[in-house]
């Protein structure tokens, strides 16, 4: 099915990137994690020691190439998968992504990537802003405590111990920032299908979304 596009939106910790990546691999589609792109900008802001509250400081994006290919996020020729998952980046990415200039630059890149045939793109404004004409829009949700548990497990797998209550606090704060920002707030597209993964495993959620894709457009990988 040439040109079939899936938009998956959802709050922090809902598992949208892991799920989207798994679905894309199973169906032979291209996965694009837009959240990783905002994290890359945040990483650059930290490395360049700019005033992160000053939108004009992000003009460095005119001279930087941020791309997403083969399941990796690149700044120029540098793969930054590990660096963008740091606590410093996580703490500041909502601020950075709230600036109209930053969003404009990255949405341009994302829409260009969206011209690729058979893609699954995940983020917070894909169905509403980046790919409003997507063939299938999914809004992935999960209970805050469940999202915190998943984030804690991810951190433990990386060798870190994190307090669950602190993670709940951080995720709740992130939800508020993402849903209340003036530019491209996190919200469900009117024609999006809600998938609640609170009581579903990763593979169960992947299976559910594959079923939705197949229902919407037939079996893509036949």
Swiss-Prot record:
Chain residues that bind ATP: 10-18
EC number: 2.7.4.25
Reactions that this protein is recorded to catalyse: CMP + ATP = CDP + ADP; dCMP + ATP = dCDP + ADP
Keywords: ATP-binding, Cytoplasm, Kinase, Nucleotide-binding, Transferase
A GO molecular function held by the record: ATP binding
GO cellular component, one term: cytosol
InterPro entries linked: Cytidylate_kin (IPR003136), Cytidylate_kinase_dom (IPR011994), P-loop_NTPase (IPR027417)
Domain of life: Bacteria
Biological process annotations from GO: nucleobase-containing small molecule interconversion; pyrimidine nucleotide metabolic process
SUPFAM superfamilies reported in the protein's UniProt record: P-loop containing nucleoside triphosphate hydrolases
Localisation: Cytoplasm
PANTHER family attached to this UniProt entry: CYTIDYLATE KINASE, CYTIDYLATE KINASE/PANTOATE-BETA-ALANINE LIGASE
Family: Belongs to the cytidylate kinase family. Type 1 subfamily.
Official protein name in the record: Cytidylate kinase
Protein species of origin: Acholeplasma laidlawii (strain PG-8A)
Name of encoding gene: cmk
